[in-house]
């Protein structure tokens, strides 16, 4: 089986239009994603890039992810040489109608476009400021340690939650590449990570395409849900008398109280 590494970390996947066929007819089946074991707890999905591109699959992914009840992270690819305001306005327009308190936004920082460290850091800071003003919290930032070390000045950034990529060397097609064991390599000056993108050539979940990106959450499932403002629903207590769900919260399994006489059939 593929799933032998990182099983203590909640599993996530991330999607873009490249996880659908070119004509849009074959798309990931979210019922299969919902039924998958180990369970997929969160899904990141590309919303757009810069100020002029919307991922055409985003709305489908968003609606389906909402339907199956997973935690959702819309992400936007930042072009560091372009206006932060135009890019974030585009991101927010794409998200029109989305309850921003129920999702976690992500800025994808992996393109330098020949810009200086100072310029890239400045653009990111402006994007952060705009999103914080609009949503009352900072987004996560996706990148990798080597890129951050070369292109960002962490001392000039606020404290952020980081989603970091690190993979094992690719195996030749059609083989799958195992997940990189958590934790990922951290940029210089960082000591914590929030999400680790562990593979870019993992088995596709949901029946579309061959490969898929996998991610792992640094914490428990309960901590993941709390991060998204959710409560982990506990299973209903089972009544020891009839085996049905019991509305009384304090009943103990396999216990019978004096107030609950048992009706016995006389043989």
Per-segment meaning from a language model:
Residues 80, 146-147, 203:
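Positions that flank functional sites
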Residues 23-24, 116-117, 151-152, 205-207:
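Short, solvent-exposed polar/charged micro-motifs at secondary-structure junctions
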Residues 1-3, 61, 93-96, 148-153, ...:
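Intrinsically disordered, low-complexity boundary segments flanking structured domains
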Residues 103-183:
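Catalytic domains of cell-wall/extracellular-matrix polysaccharide-remodeling enzymes
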Residues 2-23, 157-267:
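Functionally critical loop-and-helix segments that line ligand-binding/catalytic clefts
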Residues 1-135:
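Substrate-binding cleft of extracellular glycoside hydrolase catalytic domains
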